[in-house]
Structures are given as structure tokens and as C-alpha cells.
Curated annotation (Swiss-Prot):
HAMAP family: RapZ_like
Record-level Gene Ontology MF annotations: ATP binding; GTP binding; molecular adaptor activity
Family: Belongs to the RapZ-like family.
Protein function: Displays ATPase and GTPase activities.
Name of the featured protein: Nucleotide-binding protein THEYE_A0235
Binding positions for GTP per the UniProt entry: D62, I63, R64, V65
InterPro entries: P-loop_NTPase, RapZ-like, RapZ-like_N, RapZ_C
Species, as recorded: Thermodesulfovibrio yellowstonii (strain ATCC 51303 / DSM 11347 / YP87)
Length: 283
């Protein structure tokens, strides 16, 4: 196996953030090439191996090479036998992708086959599913803006990284658990401010809700447990060389208890010289 080169295959849904990712990788020193037909990837890598000094290489593969997708999965398996490689898959939920296409007004790669953008997105998910199954990392960018995605990619692949990039999400179980969560903490056992009439329409960023949640003995104990665990776990992630970690804290609706806890844990992580990305999914 050739350990002199590190290769990142960047793939995923159109509108998922692949362009931002490739540009960020280029900014941190990767040699990047996009939309390379899978049949010539091995030949391309062989040329780089012989004639260039690039150590880090990123290759974009997406639905635009649809006619080669069946070969792409086999190709990746072959590359993994030769090079140190990581497959990064970027995705987002349908509503987010629809909004991004509405904002950019760019045509979807499958728009020539499907007049309905919903159908194009559905078909793309199906076509790319085999690549998704081969991926080493899957990033859901639904709640990330371009700046946050750049920060995440830099933290994952930049030479300067020391600590893992941490994303911390508040959510409501009513709408499901975040698909990309590595650690999940369930706060539904804590007293619920939703049932206090004066607090029902507020959220965890409002001081009355925050004061109510944080004065509970259960909350104090729970926060202590989470902080102690994360202090221990983050040091382990550093030793492991883990690039990023997504922490999710949930309550029933995702508007009160989980929001308060996420803000508290984010402040604690900042005290450890970490810079977490905070997402309140259901606010």
C-alpha cells in the first residue's frame, strides 16, 4: 500500500456542499480535481505518484458522471487496496437542497431527465446510495452554512488540527434524532418548562426558561455528568486523531430543555479552548 499519498474522494448529493468542500481542501494544500470519470482515476493517480510531489489529493465524483457510477464503487474498493484513502459523502435533507437550488437558480444535474426537482433529488439519492454505503464519513450539511462547513472541513483535514471539530445540536424527539449524531443525551426526564404557562411560548435562549431549567437539581447533576464525560472523551478523541464529533441533546420538542443544555455545554467546551458549532435544529 502507498502511504505517501492521502486521497479523499469527495462525493454526495448535488447541493450538499461538495463545491465548498473541494475549495476548502484546495485552500489547505490539497491537489483537487472535480468531476473526474472513474475509469481514469487510477491512471490519474499513477501519474501523480510518478510525476508530482503532492501528498494530499481530493477527487470529486458525483452524479454528473452517472454513466460511470456502477464502476465507481468497484474503483474505490480497488483504490483502497493501493492508497490511503477516505471517502467523504455530503448530503442534506430534501427541503434544504430545494431551498439551495431556489437560491442559486442553478439546474440540477438530472433536470434534463426530470422536470420535477423533487423527483430528481429522489433519483439522485438512489443512484448514489452504493457510494454512500462505501463512505468513511457522512456529513449532513442541512444545518450548516458555508462558513460552518469550511470550518468543519478545515478541522477534519487541516494540518493544524489538534482537537476534533465539535458540533453540538439541540433537537426534539418529536421530529426524530439527528442522523449524524455520534453522542446523544436524552433530557426528557428533566422538569419541563413547557407546562409552565408563562414559559410555554418562550425558548431555551430566554432567561426565564434558562433560570427554570438550571435551578433544577436534576439539571445540575446531568450537566456535571455530561461535562465530566466530554472532558474524558475529548482527550480520547485527540489521541485517536478523530476529526470531528457531533453531540446531540434532545428533549420532547427541542425548544426548551435541550436548548438550555446545549448553550451550557457549548460554554463549557469553549472553556476547554474548543470552538463548537452550535445548532438549534428545532427553534
Amino acid at each position: 500500500m502507498n502511504f505517501d499519498k492521502f486521497i479523499v474522494i469527495v462525493t454526495g448529493l448535488s447541493g450538499g456542499g461538495k463545491t465548498v468542500t473541494l475549495r476548502t481542501l484546495e485552500d489547505i494544500g490539497f491537489f483537487c480535481v472535480d468531476n473526474l470519470p472513474p475509469p481514469i482515476v487510477l491512471e490519474f493517480l499513477g501519474m501523480l505518484n510518478e510525476y508530482s510531489s503532492f501528498k494530499n489529493i481530493a477527487i470529486g465524483i458525483d452524479i454528473r458522471v452517472q454513466q460511470f457510477l456502477e464502476k465507481a464503487t468497484e474503483l474505490i474498493k480497488r483504490i483502497k487496496d493501493i492508497y490511503k484513502i477516505e471517502v467523504l459523502f455530503l448530503e442534506a435533507d430534501d427541503d434544504t437542497i430545494l431551498l439551495r437550488y431556489k437560491e442559486t437558480r442553478r439546474p440540477h444535474p438530472l433536470s434534463t431527465h426530470y422536470n420535477d426537482l423533487h423527483k430528481a433529488i429522489k433519483q439522485e439519492r438512489e443512484l448514489l446510495y452504493p457510494l454512500r454505503c462505501l463512505s468513511d464519513r457522512i456529513i449532513d450539511t442541512s444545518n450548516l452554512n458555508p462558513h460552518e462547513l469550511k470550518f468543519l472541513i478545515r478541522s477534519m483535514y487541516g494540518a493544524e488540527k489538534i482537537s476534533p471539530s465539535i458540533t453540538i445540536i439541540s433537537f426534539g424527539y418529536k421530529k426524530g434524532i439527528p442522523a449524524n449524531a455520534d453522542l446523544i443525551f436524552d433530557a426528557r426526564f428533566l422538569p419541563n418548562p413547557y407546562f409552565i404557562p408563562s414559559l410555554t411560548d418562550l425558548n431555551g435562549k430566554d432567561k426565564p426558561v434558562k433560570d427554570f431549567v438550571l435551578k433544577q437539581n436534576e439539571t445540575i447533576e446531568f450537566l456535571t455528568y455530561i461535562k465530566n464525560f466530554l472532558s474524558f472523551a475529548v482527550s480520547g478523541y485527540k489521541r485517536e486523531g478523530r476529526a470531528y464529533v457531533t453531540i446531540a441533546i434532545g428533549c420532547t420538542g427541542g425548544r426548551h430543555r435541550s436548548v438550555v443544555l446545549v448553550e451550557e455545554i457549548a460554554d463549557y467546551l469553549r472553556s476547554l479552548s474548543l470552538n463548537p458549532v452550535v445548532i438549534h435544529r428545532d427553534l
